[in-house]
């Protein structure tokens, strides 16, 4: 649904209104998991819908026993098959975890997934003053549209796997959501990093990129502002534009880089235009699509969080038209017009492929999917 005064809501044929589908159900699932978090979606060229979620076996806590599950549909969402895509390393039955997936589809069709891995209690960015000993970033890949997955590859044990990591790194992980392949074939994954600076830990948004189909990566530099973290990027005319969580600011920040993440500056058309309430910010999604008239648009999902703190209510989708910035940032719809669960909620992920638009989002311990293609059709009629 959308705000009743929203142009897109007024023009939507009620018979085409998207209906939510519970993909990962905390009350009915094959793992007896009590909670699901961190949704991720990729729409594939052959029509396959591939989604992911943290299996939070014992509840919403970040510092717990967690694996990453996949849900896969080859019949446009009518039926789904479930699997564990990445398992934690089973060192500690309370705290071993892989979590917060970030995915990308390369030009070869390979699907790459990276996730953070830990084995002890404590916040990934703030618990230690030196590089955390139980931390790693793990990568897996699939060459059969998500049917099977490779063994885990440790990107942090061998420094040659990810070049240009700062010496004052506490830890890093993916930006949570999806990456892109640039027009020249470079794979770009959003990332977030914790650094030790002036006797305190600060966290920032950045990217990693690969020019060899994910075999090795190079880390870009941090954005100008700390308290940024989970982000996604799109390519526009060879530049990277980032939309990112920005804690305690009350809005989503936006940056642009013309040198593959070496330097970043504020991207004014999007920076501060999407409000996210008081207190902690929240993850969001940011993808690019093209309309029928050839306009390049950005689609952003994020909670409005009108009640502040961790309620993260009203997960909404917004649009910016890069070829007509005079329109500003427009609200498209609110797929989840409810309060989030303050113990864990508000996250979402968008995907666009072959004129189809989909979203997955957190819904009080479940992960729901909606086909938002009817709204994309309305965008085309603007």
UniProtKB/Swiss-Prot annotation:
Q: Which key words are in the record?
A: Glycosidase, Hydrolase, Repeat, Secreted
Catalytic residue positions? 62, 347
Listed GO CC annotations: cytoplasm; extracellular region; intracellular membrane-bounded organelle; membrane
User: Where are BNR repeat segments found?
Assistant: 71-82, 140-151, 208-219, 255-266
Signal peptide start and end residues: none
Q: What does this protein do?
A: Sialidases have been suggested to be pathogenic factors in microbial infections.
Where is it predominantly found?
secreted
List the source organism: Clostridium perfringens
A single GO molecular function, which one?
exo-alpha-sialidase activity
Q: Which reaction does it catalyse?
A: Hydrolysis of alpha-(2->3)-, alpha-(2->6)-, alpha-(2->8)- glycosidic linkages of terminal sialic acid residues in oligosaccharides, glycoproteins, glycolipids, colominic acid and synthetic substrates
Q: Name one Pfam family in it.
A: BNR_3
Which parts of the sequence bind substrate? 37, 245
According to its UniProt entry, one GO biological process term is: oligosaccharide catabolic process
Instruction: Note whether Secreted occurs among the keywords.
Output: yes
Top EC class, one word:
hydrolase
Taxonomy, top ranks, is:
Bacteria, Bacillati, Bacillota, Clostridia, Eubacteriales
EC number, as in UniProt: 3.2.1.18
> Where's it found, cell-wise?
Secreted
InterPro entries in alphabetical order: Sialidase (IPR011040), Sialidase_fam (IPR026856), Sialidase_sf (IPR036278), Sialidase_trypan (IPR008377)
- What's the protein name? Sialidase
Family recorded in the similarity comment = Belongs to the glycosyl hydrolase 33 family.
